[in-house]
């Protein structure tokens, strides 16, 4: 078993990077890959950079060059579910683009031409994520739709648009749908496991910067427990 782990920012991958034994670092096309082992499991940790293009590029390189059996996307997200607070976890059941619109050609809002409207997370990986959650006391999680766009969602207008068109959304962020679409095209199982760094209807830019370290700690703990369970 080789596990690919993807985070966008240095803060989102730092904890896991420090746990990799015999780490080898490779920089390519703006992406940084850290390969080695965590608790005897082969892992490749990718710091992709922010946004959908960087995430898709990095995921394609990860899959084509390192051939992971599964991909886990980690990091932070903005909470949309009413029960979520900073530090809570979201597990993807499916992922969609919230900033794609080719409805003029008969596609659903968020659906790209020639692609499914939603990218379904792997059932086994979702189960493993929930098993990991059960072993982390005092960690609250919600499983559901995660929406992605190349924008930091911090205005009431954009929040309203997303809620209107994707009423079941539990969280938003800036890379997951690109990772999911790339995994779909390569036929590699994926799941998104992120922690909440800020919550809709609150001071987004300030709270994101303030609470990102807590989100990184929560999401990294989930991924580490998943690695143990996937041995």
From Swiss-Prot:
Q: Which GO terms describe its biological process?
A: L-methionine salvage from methylthioadenosine; L-methionine salvage from S-adenosylmethionine; nucleoside catabolic process
Its Gene Ontology cellular component terms are:
cytosol
In alphabetical order, the GO MF annotations are:
adenosylhomocysteine nucleosidase activity; methylthioadenosine nucleosidase activity
Which catalytic reaction applies to this protein? Answer: S-adenosyl-L-homocysteine + H2O = S-(5-deoxy-D-ribos-5-yl)-L-homocysteine + adenine; S-methyl-5'-thioadenosine + H2O = 5-(methylsulfanyl)-D-ribose + adenine; 5'-deoxyadenosine + H2O = 5-deoxy-D-ribose + adenine
Enzyme class per UniProt: hydrolase
Chain sites annotated for binding substrate: 78, 153, 174-175
Provide the E.C. number(s) assigned to this enzyme: 3.2.2.9
Recorded metabolic or biological pathway in which this protein acts: Amino-acid biosynthesis; L-methionine biosynthesis via salvage pathway; S-methyl-5-thio-alpha-D-ribose 1-phosphate from S-methyl-5'-thioadenosine (hydrolase route): step 1/2
**Active-site residues, Swiss-Prot/TrEMBL:** 12 (proton acceptor), 198 (proton donor)
Protein origin, superkingdom: Bacteria
Q: Which UniProt keywords apply?
A: Amino-acid biosynthesis, Hydrolase, Methionine biosynthesis
What's this protein's function? Catalyzes the irreversible cleavage of the glycosidic bond in both 5'-methylthioadenosine (MTA) and S-adenosylhomocysteine (SAH/AdoHcy) to adenine and the corresponding thioribose, 5'-methylthioribose and S-ribosylhomocysteine, respectively. Also cleaves 5'-deoxyadenosine, a toxic by-product of radical S-adenosylmethionine (SAM) enzymes, into 5-deoxyribose and adenine.
The Swiss-Prot or TrEMBL record describes its family as follows: Belongs to the PNP/UDP phosphorylase family. MtnN subfamily.
Q: Which PANTHER family match?
A: 5'-METHYLTHIOADENOSINE/S-ADENOSYLHOMOCYSTEINE NUCLEOSIDASE, 5'-METHYLTHIOADENOSINE_S-ADENOSYLHOMOCYSTEINE NUCLEOSIDASE
Question: Mind telling me what this protein is named?
Answer: 5'-methylthioadenosine/S-adenosylhomocysteine nucleosidase
């Amino acid at each position: 078993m080789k596990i690919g782990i993807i985070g966008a920012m240095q803060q989102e991958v730092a904890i896991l990077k420090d746990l990799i034994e015999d780490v080898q670092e490779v920089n390519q096309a703006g992406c940084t890959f850290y390969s080695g082992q965590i608790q005897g499991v082969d892992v490749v940790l990718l710091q992709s950079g922010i946004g959908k293009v960087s995430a898709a590029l990095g995921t394609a390189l990860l899959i084509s060059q390192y051939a992971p059996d599964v991909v886990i996307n980690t990091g932070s997200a903005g909470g949309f579910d009413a029960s979520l607070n900073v530090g809570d976890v979201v597990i993807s059941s499916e992922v969609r683009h919230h900033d794609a619109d080719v409805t003029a050609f008969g596609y659903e809002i968020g659906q790209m031409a020639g692609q499914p409207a939603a990218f379904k997370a792997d059932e086994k990986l979702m189960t493993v994520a929930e098993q990991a959650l059960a072993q982390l006391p005092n960690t609250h999680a919600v499983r559901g739709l995660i929406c992605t766009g190349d924008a930091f969602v911090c205005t009431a207008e954009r929040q309203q648009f997303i809620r209107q068109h994707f009423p079941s959304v539990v969280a938003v962020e800036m890379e997951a749908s690109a990772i999911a679409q790339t995994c779909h095209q390569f036929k590699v199982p994926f799941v998104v496991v992120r922690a909440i760094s800020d919550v809709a209807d609150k001071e987004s830019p300030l709270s994101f910067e303030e609470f990102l370290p807590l989100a990184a700690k929560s999401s990294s703990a989930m991924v580490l427990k998943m690695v143990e369970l996937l041995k």
